[in-house]
A protein has these predicted regions:
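Non-catalytic cap/lid and distal C-terminal segments of serine-dependent acyl enzymes
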Residues: 1-213
Length: 213
């Protein structure tokens, strides 16, 4: 939920960059209970509801963020928009970044799963495919104009290998990016690194300077 970044103190973790004027954070609610997490629901309806949410982010939330950066922070313009999330939020962050690299100049994704099979099982249609990064990036054409954006922007995908982590699709993306010469930093942390906030704080602090430099 949108309040998790504050309630679980991720906002406090990012405070040095916020207070120094390098970072502005907008935490946006998801529709996970209606979409990815409602595994007993109609997948045809759920994926279309998810697509509506993505377009809300791109068409409404990002323009609102640009407005707020001027109204609240006095910035002339946003230097860039980074998609950031943990767990299923990381899944959304990677999907947003890869689908709209002309809007999102970077990505920080911690402990996500990057195939739509996680939420939609064996159901497949065009929209499910479009929201399954392992699938669409595996077949992504070399001559697509987004390739230049991917190769000139900064994205980090990180996953631990300890309790409750599911790193398999992170490994898949790593191999796909390497084969396509896309310099996403895909980083697998150790077997002691679990799927929980205490590790996400450490990872955010570790990667944020790279993302912002």
């Amino acid at each position: 939920r949108f309040f998790d970044f504050e309630d679980f103190h991720m906002a406090d973790t990012l405070a040095p960059w916020i207070e120094s004027g390098q970072l502005m954070v907008m935490s946006i609610d998801t529709l996970d209970k209606e979409t990815w997490s409602d595994t007993n629901g109609d997948p045809y309806w759920r994926i279309r509801r998810y697509e509506q949410w993505l377009h809300y982010i791109v068409d409404e939330a990002v323009p609102k963020l640009r407005y707020l950066s001027k109204e609240r922070n006095g910035w002339d313009d946003l230097p860039g928009v980074i998609a950031f999330g943990c767990s299923l939020g990381a899944t959304h962050a990677v999907n947003l970044y890869l689908r709209w690299p002309d809007i999102f100049c970077g990505c920080l994704a911690l402990s996500g799963i990057y195939t739509a099979h996680y939420g939609f099982g064996d159901y497949m249609d065009e929209l499910v495919y479009m929201n399954s990064p392992v699938d669409y990036m595996r077949n992504f054409p070399e001559d697509h104009p987004y390739m230049e954006l991917y190769r000139n922007q900064k994205a980090v995908i990180c996953c631990g290998q300890g309790a409750w982590e599911q790193p398999d699709t992170t490994w898949m993306l790593k191999r796909i990016f390497e084969a396509k010469n896309i310099p996403v930093w895909v980083d697998l942390w150790g077997h002691d690194v679990k799927h929980d906030w205490d590790w996400w704080y450490k990872q955010a602090v570790y990667y944020m300077p790279y993302i912002l430099e």
